[in-house]
Amino acid sequence: MKEQKKVFIKTLGCQMNEYDSARMHEVLNEHFDTVKTDDYKDADIILINTCSIREKAQEKVFHELGRWKGLKKTNEDLIIGVGGCVASQEGENIIKRAPFVDLVFGPQTIHRLPEMIKQKQKTQQSQVDISFPEVEKFDYLPEPKAEGAKAYVSIMEGCDKYCSYCVVPYTRGPEVNRPFEDVLAECAILAEQGVKEITLLGQNVNHYLGPMENGQTADLALLIHFIAEIDGIERIRFTTSHPVEFSQNLIDAYATVPELANHLHLPVQHGSDRILINMKRNHTILEFKQKIRKLRAIRPDITISSDFIVGFPGETEEDFQKLLDLVKEINFDQSFSFIYSKRPGTPAADLPDDTPMEVKKDRLKRLQDLLNSNAQIISRQMVGTNQRILVDGTSKKDDNILSGRTENNRVVNFKGDKSLIGQFAMVKITESLPNSLRGELI
């Protein structure tokens, strides 16, 4: 009989990391019969799945590790591990800075966690494996287990874009595409377990080129068409996309696949062609707007969110105004926006940057104020409309109130029977609040 171990996993960063954290627990459970715990003080294994997109996210890792250091005094068998992109970037340096850490593993070596733990216990030496093995982690995925009506499905890993500011190609490695039939099989299993909404994940998900058993290659549009045919799957999302690979095939899918959510997250990063060139984004603002126009010709009411970087080296007030103009023209919905964070080893780190931080903070506030205004207007326009809600559970504030999300990712709270959890429900929107909507069951 396997010894049961309590596992605490803290996840920082993107949805891919959330997916990876779920895989960590499943891999460990196959070998050690693990149970999750929300209290790190009660755990036998503590893992932090890290993000290195921004400097603050990196420092947060060592802050968390500092909180856990003292636990070793009362539990000498405790295993502490660091995974994710900071692990890939820092490697052995994590052990040097925090010698009490037992494991350092990258996104591609999650499947080796059980063996790393055994080696640590056998040798009493910290284990580091941040390689990009020839055999991808997709070959070692455990049987998928649904947790609710929504699920993430990873379809590709890594990125070949090498945008000048980004560490992802260095931490996640080159693009690796998961076989087409394997993705469909996982989606079918999840559907049998009650999953109704699938979010397809990849660092550059719309560049998916999955090998097929017949020797051909499937793009994201073809994959979406096939997933939509699986009984039980009623809503499909994908993230994160790059404008260059937002193809006509994918745009056309919005006309023929009603299961595709009426919302798109498409990071543009900036509104100035000059800045986009320095970012090595390989597209112009005109090309971006042309693709959005084609999409809205098919789905006029689709909402579009994005990612924005403010204060990139060399950004002028004129550049920033072009960004604001783009946000107004496209009418971007709720989006992510950050001040540029210099990442060591990236080309942008060597660019001269003489814009004062006070100016960058002011620009970020102006951008966020505009984005928030857009989002509030979109929310208010939804009042009086009927929305199809996937009911996730109950409200965080009131266990007697149901909660779910619209196609455009709005949280809606409404009264209803708990038997609706995990199902779709039609709800009339009655009120717009700053961070959510209220509604009535139809």
UniProtKB/Swiss-Prot annotation:
[4Fe-4S] cluster 2 binds at residues 159, 163, 166. The keyword Iron applies. Keywords: 4Fe-4S, Cytoplasm, Iron, Iron-sulfur, Metal-binding, S-adenosyl-L-methionine, Transferase, tRNA processing. Gene3D superfamilies: Methylthiotransferase, N-terminal domain (3.40.50.12160), tm_1862 like domain (3.80.30.20). Belongs to the methylthiotransferase family. MiaB subfamily. It is found in: Cytoplasm. GO terms for cellular component: cytosol. Its cofactor is [4Fe-4S] cluster. Catalyzes the methylthiolation of N6-(dimethylallyl)adenosine (i(6)A), leading to the formation of 2-methylthio-N6-(dimethylallyl)adenosine (ms(2)i(6)A) at position 37 in tRNAs that read codons beginning with uridine. This is tRNA-2-methylthio-N(6)-dimethylallyladenosine synthase. NCBIfam families: miaB-methiolase, MiaB/RimO family radical SAM methylthiotransferase. CDD domains: Radical_SAM. Monomer. The keyword Transmembrane helix does not apply. [4Fe-4S] cluster 1 binds at residues 14, 51, 85. PANTHER family: CDK5 REGULATORY SUBUNIT-ASSOCIATED PROTEIN 1 (PTHR43020), MITOCHONDRIAL TRNA METHYLTHIOTRANSFERASE CDK5RAP1 (PTHR43020:SF2). Residues 5-122 form the MTTase N-terminal domain. One of its GO terms (molecular function) is 4 iron, 4 sulfur cluster binding. It comes from Francisella tularensis subsp. tularensis (strain SCHU S4 / Schu 4). Its EC number is 2.8.4.3. Residues 380-442 form the TRAM domain. Residues 145-378 form the Radical SAM core domain. Binds 2 [4Fe-4S] clusters. One cluster is coordinated with 3 cysteines and an exchangeable S-adenosyl-L-methionine. It comes from the Bacteria. It catalyses: N(6)-dimethylallyladenosine(37) in tRNA + (sulfur carrier)-SH + AH2 + 2 S-adenosyl-L-methionine = 2-methylsulfanyl-N(6)-dimethylallyladenosine(37) in tRNA + (sulfur carrier)-H + 5'-deoxyadenosine + L-methionine + A + S-adenosyl-L-homocysteine + 2 H(+).
